């Protein structure tokens, strides 16, 4: 089974076993929802059940049902929390996990020709931008917006695009 990193446990918070985590997921509200099952990267057989959680400054505080005091919580310091693929959940239409977009072939929707591959993803603002690398090594960013990204076929690892003028530097 595949697991995905969601947070790093930084320290304890209070005396009742609550931990402060640095978030490594785009979906903390879902990942840390009451009843959610998480594991430790170092021991995926150990399941921790979220009892409650809340944002705290730029971090999150999580209380697990199985961790009831500061001594138990202290042993988790530095651990990476992971979610299993089966617990990862479905995303709304038009939202994708980064791992599903990396290495997708980029296809010109009009011509059907392969343009390149997605090799990086950044989130500078309202929309993600995807770095396309052509076979000759030329790279450029495309925004993940409806005017450009027309269709994503995760199963086939293909992204169909209509490139706006100026997105791709033509020699």
UniProtKB/Swiss-Prot annotation:
Q: Which GO terms describe its molecular function?
A: ribosome binding
Say yes or no: keyword Electron transport present: no
Give the source's domain of life in one word. Bacteria
The question of whether Repeat is a record keyword is answered with no
Q: Which Pfam families match?
A: PRC_RimM, RimM
Task: State its location(s).
Answer: Cytoplasm
- Domain named PRC barrel: which ranges? 93-167
Query: Record's Gene Ontology CC terms?
Result: cytoplasm; ribosome
Q: Which UniProt keywords apply?
A: Chaperone, Cytoplasm, Ribosome biogenesis, rRNA processing
A single GO BP annotation from the record? rRNA processing
Which family does the similarity line name?
A: Belongs to the RimM family.
Tell me the function of this protein.
An accessory protein needed during the final step in the assembly of 30S ribosomal subunit, possibly for assembly of the head region. Essential for efficient processing of 16S rRNA. May be needed both before and after RbfA during the maturation of 16S rRNA. It has affinity for free ribosomal 30S subunits but not for 70S ribosomes.
Notes concerning its domains? The PRC barrel domain binds ribosomal protein uS19.
Q: Which NCBIfam families match?
A: 16S_RimM
Q: How does it assemble?
A: Binds ribosomal protein uS19.
Q: Which PANTHER family match?
A: RIBOSOME MATURATION FACTOR RIMM
Return the protein name.
Ribosome maturation factor RimM
Origin organism of this chain?
Lactobacillus helveticus (strain DPC 4571)
């Amino acid at each position: 089974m595949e697991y995905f990193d969601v947070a790093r446990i930084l320290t304890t918070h209070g005396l009742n076993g609550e931990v402060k985590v640095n978030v490594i997921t785009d979906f903390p509200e879902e990942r840390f929802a009451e009843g959610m099952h998480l594991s430790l990267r170092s021991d995926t057989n150990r399941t921790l059940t979220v009892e409650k959680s809340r944002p705290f400054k730029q971090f999150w505080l999580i209380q697990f049902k199985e961790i009831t005091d500061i001594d138990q919580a202290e042993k988790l310091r530095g651990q990476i929390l992971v979610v299993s693929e089966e617990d990862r959940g479905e995303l709304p239409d038009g939202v994708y996990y980064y791992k599903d977009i990396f290495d997708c072939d980029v296809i010109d929707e009009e011509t059907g020709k392969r343009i390149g591959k997605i090799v990086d993803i950044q989130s500078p603002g309202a929309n993600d931008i995807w770095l396309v690398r052509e076979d000759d090594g030329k790279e450029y960013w495309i925004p993940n917006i409806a005017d450009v990204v027309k269709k994503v076929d995760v199963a086939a690892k293909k992204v169909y695009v209509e490139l706006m003028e100026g997105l791709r530097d033509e020699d």
